[in-house]
C-alpha cells in the first residue's frame, strides 16, 4: 500500500511540472486559502484521502517571502484498520518563481516511521537533506508538493498532442526524473461538475505495484485553475482511481 500511495502521489504532484522549457504565467493561478481534497479508490472502495492547502506564513528564506504548502494524507475505512497511514508534508516556495526552499515530511505508515527535511539551493544545484547533499541537474528541482503548484502556473497554451516533457524531483533521498506525455482534451464528470480537462500520461515503472503494460492518466481542469480532478492506473491486481472531493478558495471559477 505504501508503494502504491507514493506512486500516485508522485503522479498527482509531479505530473504537470514538465520542466523549465515552459514559461510561468505572470501571476500564480492559486492563492492563500485554497483547499483541495481528494479520495483514492481501490476498485469501488475508498482507500485513502488527502487534503492540500495553501497557507500564509511569515517565514522567509534568503530574505524572500514564501507560500507554505501543506498536505495531509490518511487511509480510511477498512484500509485504515489493516494499514494505518498518517502522513504530513510541508513545502515552502518562493512567491515569485515558485521553486522550493525547504521541504519536510512526517511519515507514519503502520509501524514505519520517517521524518525528513530538505533544503533546496537552486542556484548551486544541490539539495541538502538528512542523509547528505545531493547534486541536481538543473536550477529547478522540486519536492513532490512544490512541483504540483509550480506546474499549475506554467503557460501550457502551446502544448500539442504527443509532446513530452520531464520533471526533476527529490524524493526518498534521491533525484529522479519523470517523463510526461500530453494526450489531449476530454470532458470528465467529477464532484465539481462535468468539466473540460487536459489529459496527461506520465511514465511509470513496472514492478511490485504496476504491471508492465500499465498506463497512468491524469486529468486537470482546462481553465484558469489547472486543478487535477482525476487520476487512474491499472495495478497488478485491479485498478486505482484518484478523484477530487472538493475545492475551496480557488482563484477563478471552475471552467473559466
Which residues does each predicted region cover?
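Sec-dependent N-terminal signal peptides
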Residues: 4-13
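Sec/Tat signal peptide C-region and signal peptidase I cleavage site
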Residues: 15-19
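Acidic, serine/threonine-rich low-complexity disordered tracts
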Residues: 20-120, 158-256
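Hydrophobic, well-structured mid-protein blocks that either form specific transmembrane helices
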Residues: 112-155
Amino acid at each position: 500500500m505504501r508503494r502504491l500511495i507514493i506512486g500516485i502521489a508522485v503522479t498527482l504532484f509531479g505530473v504537470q511540472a514538465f520542466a523549465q522549457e515552459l514559461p510561468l504565467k505572470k501571476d500564480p493561478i492559486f492563492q492563500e486559502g485554497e483547499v483541495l481534497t481528494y479520495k483514492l479508490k481501490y476498485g469501488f472502495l475508498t482507500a485513502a484521502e488527502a487534503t492540500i492547502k495553501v497557507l500564509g506564513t511569515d517565514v522567509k528564506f534568503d530574505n524572500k517571502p514564501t507560500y507554505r504548502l501543506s498536505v495531509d494524507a490518511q487511509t480510511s475505512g477498512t484500509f485504515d484498520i489493516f494499514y494505518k497511514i498518517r502522513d504530513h508534508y510541508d513545502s515552502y516556495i518562493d512567491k515569485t518563481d515558485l521553486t522550493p526552499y525547504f521541504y519536510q515530511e512526517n511519515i507514519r505508515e503502520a509501524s514505519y516511521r520517517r521524518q525528513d527535511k530538505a533544503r533546496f539551493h537552486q542556484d548551486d544545484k544541490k539539495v541538502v537533506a538528512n542523509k547528505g547533499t545531493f547534486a541536481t541537474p538543473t536550477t529547478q528541482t522540486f519536492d513532490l508538493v512544490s512541483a504540483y503548484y509550480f506546474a499549475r502556473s506554467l503557460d501550457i497554451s502551446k502544448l500539442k498532442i504527443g509532446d513530452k516533457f520531464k520533471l526533476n524531483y527529490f524524493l526518498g533521498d534521491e533525484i529522479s526524473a519523470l517523463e510526461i506525455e500530453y494526450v489531449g482534451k476530454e470532458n470528465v464528470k467529477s464532484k465539481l461538475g462535468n468539466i473540460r480537462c487536459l489529459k496527461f500520461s506520465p511514465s511509470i515503472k513496472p514492478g511490485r505495484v504496476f504491471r508492465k503494460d500499465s498506463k497512468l492518466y491524469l486529468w486537470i481542469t482546462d481553465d484558469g485553475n489547472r486543478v487535477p480532478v482525476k487520476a487512474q492506473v491499472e495495478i497488478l491486481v485491479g485498478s486505482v482511481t484518484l478523484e477530487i472531493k472538493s475545492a475551496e478558495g480557488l482563484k477563478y471559477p471552475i471552467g473559466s
